[in-house]
Regions:
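Conserved mid-core segment of classical short-chain dehydrogenase/reductases
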Residues: 85, 95-111, 130, 155
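Residue(s) in the substrate-gating loop at a strand-loop-helix junction
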Residues: 146
Length: 254
């Protein structure tokens, strides 16, 4: 690993917008280092001088699973091995579509969605744990979950399955880490219904195309969506505390 000093370092997927972007900005404002991953660029780069070089952006498509080990290696090479007090991995990126009955979804669509929303977080976590096991720093993985991981919905089979998988994966890894010399903390955090691009995608579907489109529109029109910034603030509190991974942590929990 590198020689750059710093207190806390966070690897965050999906920092180009939504919760990932807000979380990165709040952590940077606290003086932390952030390594953002997204398929495209990031607005954070435009204000990189404001962050005193503490934001690094990596453009990468998480659907490309075979390169994730090297991705984590490249990022960890920039993080100090001795000076870092905390290293975190926030698996935030996810793909909502396809929003159709499963018999109307192609193999390519199913594969891409599951790769980004489930397989990538698993591989990122595996590589992160393996490559930081020699460190004494506190380590934590946060997996962004969803109510869809617990409640089945028509035309959302792929997304619901990916989030259910994230929840179970989190609990399994927590059990694996129990009793380790420097265990990695891991939690699944359900942010609730948030005003993000995923919500906009769901609202943009016709009722014929997506049966729940009306419900998503109603939630938006009645002002029930939470802002990404509010969710990011609450998530930072969960990052700081030592949490129980035996259940999904909901944003409404005190």
């Amino acid at each position: 690993m590198g020689t750059e000093t710093g207190r806390r370092h966070f690897i965050i997927t999906g920092t180009s917008k939504g919760i990932g972007l807000q979380l990165a900005e709040l952590l940077l404002a606290k003086g932390d280092y952030v390594y953002g991953i997204s398929r495209g660029g990031s607005d954070l780069l435009e204000s990189s001088e404001e962050w005193s070089g503490r934001y690094r952006h990596v453009q990468y498509d998480l659907a490309e699973l075979n390169g994730i080990d090297d991705l984590i290696t490249r990022i960890l090479d920039q993080i100090p091995s001795q000076e870092a007090e905390f290293i975190g991995l926030i698996n935030n990126a996810a793909m909502l579509e396809p929003l159709r009955p499963i018999d109307q979804c192609s193999a390519a669509e199913i594969s891409q969605s599951l790769n980004i929303s489930l397989a990538a977080p698993m591989i990122l976590s595996s590589s992160f744990i393996q490559q930081t096991n020699h460190l004494s720093a506190r380590r934590k993985i946060v997996n962004l979950s969803s109510g869809s991981g617990s409640y089945p919905a028509p035309s959302m089979a792929v997304y619901c399955t990916s989030k259910a998988g994230v929840n179970m994966f989190t609990q399994c890894v927590s059990l694996e880490q129990t009793g380790q010399q420097n265990p990695v903390e891991i939690i699944a955090f359900d942010p609730g219904m948030v005003d993000t691009e995923l919500q906009a995608v769901a609202r943009g579907k016709s009722a014929e195309e997506f049966a729940l489109a009306g419900m998503f529109n109603q939630v938006y029109e009645t002002g029930q969506l939470r802002s990404p910034q509010d969710v990011a603030k609450q998530l930072i509190v969960r990052i700081d505390e030592h949490s129980d991974a035996s259940h999904v942590i909901h944003s409404t929990e005190s």
